[in-house]
Design a protein with these regions (language model features):
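Bacterial Sec-dependent N-terminal signal peptides
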Residues: 1, 16-42
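Terminal, contiguous helix-loop blocks that mediate binding/assembly
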Residues: 33, 203-549
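Solvent-exposed loop/turn segments at secondary-structure junctions
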Residues: 52-55, 86-90, 192-198, 218-219, ...
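Extracytoplasmic/secreted envelope proteins and their assembly/folding machinery
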Residues: 61-64, 68, 167-175, 233, ...
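Substrate-binding cleft of extracellular glycoside hydrolase catalytic domains
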Residues: 81-184, 198, 205-219
Length: 549
């Protein structure tokens, strides 16, 4: 399904505002698996690069295990290779000794057939091969074996607790894959946590921009919040760019990565990129559809579009309840043609120019309208300051038609639609004609807030404000009386390892668009909560007259 942004006239019909360190590379690139030499060059090599980030090891490996479900004939034309780093302290057996882990694995496997072992829960299955803490494994998928069998027979690669998020490590892996399993085309898949755009996740090197793939074996310099070292957009792009081959597509099996600040920094290292605006579901996707579609000889764009559909359909089949169709589900996938982002940038810059000028020099009524739109921006995750870009711009265009006229909005819609090759989102969202768009950051005078929620009952626990000068203030949320009211109490001051000027303002997105001008100027706080994190029910009125996006 190709999503098309509506013209401004159509928007008027339906819009409603909703209030250098040791790396995993070594001098010895010996392949731990003996490859089978193909009679002809393979159609594609899929390169999977993932780590557990402390608490998702079983989930990403359950997703990876789906590759073994690809059609047998697909393995004749497609290679699948992997590099996986086990968390240094995986949550599954965080409080157990190595001896206790081995004992439980033996107990779980006792008397079980191969099929029974493969049918185990994700956590129990992880115990069956219990990778060494902080070890890195490199191997190629052998369809004659199971993931468990391959993990048990694969020796750790490189140094223990290597820096998995070092660009050299990623480059080394891609080069090994291309040299050992050459193919006509290459697809890179990244698996772990996605951090959303956060300047405080920027590492010191190269004015980086985004956090993804969090290595629990290393710290990044934050005194508050997520301390794990991670890839930034620039360090990730450098790892891909320095490789000997260029992937035609990149799949980010990570949450929150369909973000403009990230996409602009990686747009030149691949032709197509697949990622999600909201959080994505692990363990119930359709990873096997990727080799099956590539083996069928489809062009990369068509194969990735089918992959998007297969994953979201699988999530729907597992999560959508036809007896309760109004039960909220928020998930999505978008396929972007990266070169089209170049045409979107000047339109976004013009939008920013008009917004900043109106806020500074417009009437009191215009400024109030802008504040109202900001206060009702649609957030995509509770914890981070990421907001739906198109909905925000649509609301501003609706409220300020004298500033953002029909002709301008239509130019924006055309450039926006050209970027999106294919998109699919939850059946629940589709039934409500609820579009899902790229995210971007919002801030107040350059300050943004990260919220810590109890994921069990979605109660707010704390909030950390990140200031442009690199300082932070964390306040604990204290419940009030029986009415449910609460208040913030100061907890501590801290720092993050850089400044707004050295992080956000060095992004490709900001250099092209100048969005930081608005982030530093805006004086209205955007919403602290998002519909998806609280499973917010969209309006259940008859939606039949609302045009399909």
């Amino acid at each position: 399904m190709k999503k098309n942004l509506l013209t401004l006239a159509a928007v008027l019909c339906w819009w409603v505002a909703i209030p250098i360190i040791t790396s995993c590379s070594t001098d010895n690139d010996d392949n731990p698996v003996t490859p089978i030499e193909p009679e002809a060059l393979a159609e594609c090599t899929i390169m999977w690069y993932g780590t557990g980030g402390g608490n998702v090891d079983p989930y990403i490996l359950t997703d990876f295990r789906q590759f073994y479900d690809a059609r047998p004939e697909s393995f004749d034309r497609v290679n699948i290779v992997a590099q996986y780093k086990a968390s240094l302290n995986p949550s599954v057996y965080r409080d157990m000794t190595d001896e206790e882990v081995s004992q439980k694995a033996e107990e779980l496997a006792a008397g079980k057939t191969v099929d029974e072992l493969e049918a185990m829960t994700m956590e129990d299955y992880f115990f069956l091969f219990h990778p060494k803490r902080g070890a890195t494994y490199r191997f190629a998928v052998d369809p004659a074996k199971t993931l468990r069998q391959q993990m048990l027979e694969t020796e750790p690669y490189g140094a223990m607790n290597c820096n998995f998020t070092c660009p050299d490590s990623l480059t080394n892996f891609i080069n090994w894959a291309a040299r050992t399993y050459p193919a006509k085309r290459y697809i890179l898949v990244m698996a772990d946590h996605g951090g959303g755009y956060l300047p405080n996740h920027d590492v010191a090197e190269a004015a980086a921009t985004r956090g993804m793939v969090f290595d629990d074996g290393y710290e990044n310099g934050n005194t508050i919040g997520n301390k794990h070292k991670c890839f930034s957009a620039k360090s990730f792009a450098r790892g891909v760019r320095n490789a000997d081959v260029r992937p035609e597509g990149i799949v980010l099996y990570l949450c929150l990565m369909n973000n403009l600040e990230f996409l602009y920094d990686v747009k030149d290292v691949t032709d197509h990129i697949v990622c999600s605006t909201y959080t994505l579901w692990g363990t119930i996707g359709a990873m096997q559809s990727l080799p099956d579609n590539m083996a069928a000889g489809l062009d990369t764009r068509a194969a990735l579009a089918n992959f998007v559909d297969a994953n979201v359909d699988s999530w729907d089949n597992n999560l959508y309840n036809p007896d309760h169709p109004e039960e909220p589900n928020y998930y999505d996938m978008t396929l972007t043609e990266t070169k089209r982002l170049n045409d979107l940038a000047p339109v976004l810059k013009e939008f920013t120019d008009r917004l900043v000028d109106t806020y500074q020099n417009g009437t009191a009524e215009q400024r109030a309208a802008i504040d109202e739109c900001t206060a009702n921006a649609v957030k995509v995750v509770n914890q981070y300051s990421l907001y739906d870009m198109a909905k925000y711009m649509e609301s501003l265009s609706l409220m300020l038609p004298d500033v953002f006229d029909y002709a301008f909005y239509d130019r924006f819609a055309d450039a926006f639609n050209a970027c999106i090759v294919h998109q699919r989102y939850a059946r629940y969202l589709t039934n409500h004609n609820y579009q899902v768009d790229y995210s971007m950051m919002l801030a107040v005078k350059g300050c943004y807030v990260c919220y810590d929620y109890d994921t069990t009952d979605t109660k707010l626990q704390a909030a950390t404000a990140y200031y442009p000068d690199g300082t932070t203030t964390t306040s604990k949320y204290v419940l009030g009386d029986d009415s449910g009211d609460g208040h913030y109490e100061f907890q501590e001051n801290g720092t993050w390892p850089s400044t707004f000027a050295d992080t956000y303002q060095q992004t490709t997105f900001d250099r092209l668009v100048g969005w930081s001008r608005w982030l530093l100027l805006n004086e209205t706080a955007p919403p602290a909560w998002c519909p998806s994190s609280f499973n917010f029910e969209l309006p259940s009125d008859d939606m039949s007259e609302i045009p399909v996006l």
